[in-house]
């Protein structure tokens, strides 16, 4: 009888590394393939969601044309779901049944309590005011942060004054959120008591986007007034 111990075969470190590398590569290919396979569908769903939000904040709109406001203070059309060029600001022009401009809509975002609060707001050129907003995405605390959607006093902030300054460098007055009950100016947002951070996010998102966009739109009103 052979008394020599039978030792199990060992796997070298190099072989283990090769195996793990192969597994990682296969997993990577699967993940990339899944991402590429669903990318178009995800983007289309996002486009549809934003389009619905535009119709919500501009009720008179029956059709939408997507534009980009360029750093040169000109505007140009972009395809549906398209991306604005570098340095440009994307916006949506809503037109009524007669092809007349019913309002402008644009996205904005700012840090909320849990994460960024992404909104889409409507701007009326005749009154130089933000008339409404809709939430595109947020992760605020249910029952607290999401009060911005239903709180009647908060929604009464709109229309919100957003006049462009005479020199077209920005807004005549910064849109800012103030403590609940202390609003005295038409460009101030009266915060929700207990949801101040989310309220501030809405005000900042609107202000930052409006400061960048509206001065570029002002010189191009004639181009936007009629759907072409």
Residue ranges, per PLM feature:
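Flexible, solvent-exposed loop/hinge segments and secondary-structure transition points
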Residues: 2-228
């Amino acid at each position: 009888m052979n008394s020599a111990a039978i030792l199990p075969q060992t796997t070298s470190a190099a072989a283990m590394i090769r195996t793990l590398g192969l597994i990682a590569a296969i997993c990577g290919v699967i993940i990339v393939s899944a991402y590429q396979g669903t990318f178009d569908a995800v983007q289309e769903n996002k486009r549809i969601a934003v389009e619905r939000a535009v119709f919500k904040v501009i009720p008179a709109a029956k059709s939408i044309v997507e534009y980009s406001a360029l750093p040169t203070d000109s505007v140009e059309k972009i395809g549906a779901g398209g991306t604005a060029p570098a340095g440009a600001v994307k916006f949506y022009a809503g037109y009524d049944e007669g092809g007349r401009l019913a309002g402008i809509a644009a996205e904005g975002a700012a840090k909320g309590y849990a994460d960024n609060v992404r909104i889409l707001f409507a701007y009326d050129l005749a009154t130089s005011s933000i008339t409404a907003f809709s939430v595109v995405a947020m992760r605020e605390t249910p029952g607290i942060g999401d009060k911005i959607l239903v709180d009647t006093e908060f929604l009464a902030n709109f229309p919100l004054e957003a006049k462009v300054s005479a020199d077209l460098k920005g807004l005549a007055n910064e849109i800012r959120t103030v403590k609940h009950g202390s609003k005295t100016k038409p460009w101030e947002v009266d915060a929700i008591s207990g949801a101040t951070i989310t309220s501030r996010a809405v005000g900042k998102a609107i202000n930052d986007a409006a400061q960048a966009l509206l001065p570029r739109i002002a010189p191009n009103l004639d181009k936007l007034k009629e759907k072409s």
